[in-house]
Design a protein with these regions (language model features):
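Non-catalytic propeptide/linker segments at domain boundaries
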Residues: 28-67
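Single conserved hydrophobic/aromatic residue that forms the stacking wall/gate
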Residues: 1-14
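Ampiphathic alpha-helical segments that act as solvent-exposed interaction surfaces
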Residues: 13-33
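Amphipathic alpha-helical segments that form well-ordered structural scaffolds
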Residues: 19, 23, 88-91, 125, ...
Length: 237
């Protein structure tokens, strides 16, 4: 019985491998037929737009569906975009009087780059009146250089990582990156987040003195949404 199960598992692996090889070959212009299997195979094909290719080839720093310079920027993966994101956007716009641009980073320092399928799936979530941009700026200090005089919508958990030395070469290096927020006139609207079953807001974060005046917290009474995109993905799966 154990031997038969192993053989069945090997057969399944071989078929999956053949499917992957076939798709890779076809994407490179070669013919390689899919194996004959009982299951229905659905293939979603995404052809990269020329602007996406330019971004990944470092020909441009960002691409956007809006010709105006972004002022209020909401970085995130938006996988998926949910009601909490929309509420944050609305509150930030009311607070600043600015129009939000959602920012999706195609290449984060601590994550694999987004696939073209993931890029299309993310962009397709936004409504026609919503602005978005795809960037190559993984660090907030890089975003600051790319979009000076901007306000960033940020969760308290993300802001904690911005001030965490382990993401830098040294304390001096961290402070050099943080100084760029002053150099490029960057401000932050900080929304509270649930971290390890505790609600963390701006007042719980040790913000360096040199930019403490650039951070404005949104009170928990105005916004609290403990649902995360990760939890939504787990529920959907």
């Amino acid at each position: 019985h154990l031997q038969r199960r192993r053989q069945r598992q090997m057969c399944i692996r071989d078929r999956i491998t053949s499917c992957v090889i076939s798709l890779l070959a076809n994407s490179c212009g070669f013919e390689f037929n899919l194996p004959s299997i009982d299951e229905e195979i659905r293939i979603n094909e995404v052809i990269a737009e020329k602007s996406w290719e330019k971004l990944f080839n470092d020909k441009v720093g960002f691409i956007s569906n809006n010709i105006s310079n972004p002022e209020l920027i909401f970085p995130g993966s938006f996988n998926p975009l949910h009601e909490g994101h929309i509420k944050m956007k609305e509150l930030a716009e009311k607070k600043t009087g600015m129009h939000t641009t959602f920012e999706i980073c195609a290449r984060n320092a601590d994550k694999p780059p987004l696939t073209f399928y993931e890029i299309k799936r993310t962009i397709d979530q936004f409504q026609n009146d919503e602005s978005w941009m795809l960037t190559s700026a993984g660090r907030f200090s890089e975003k600051a250089e790319m979009f000076p005089n901007s306000v960033f919508i940020i969760g308290a958990d993300t802001l904690m990582r911005v001030f965490d030395e382990k993401f830098y070469d040294s304390h001096k290096n961290m402070m050099e990156h943080i100084q760029r927020f002053n150099d490029h006139n960057i401000n932050f609207l900080v929304f509270g987040r649930k971290v390890n079953n505790n609600f963390i807001s701006l007042k719980n974060i040790n913000v360096p003195d040199i930019i403490v005046d650039r951070c404005t917290g949104i009170d928990e009474s105005l916004f609290r949404d403990d649902i995360s995109s990760t939890e939504i993905r787990m529920t959907n799966n």
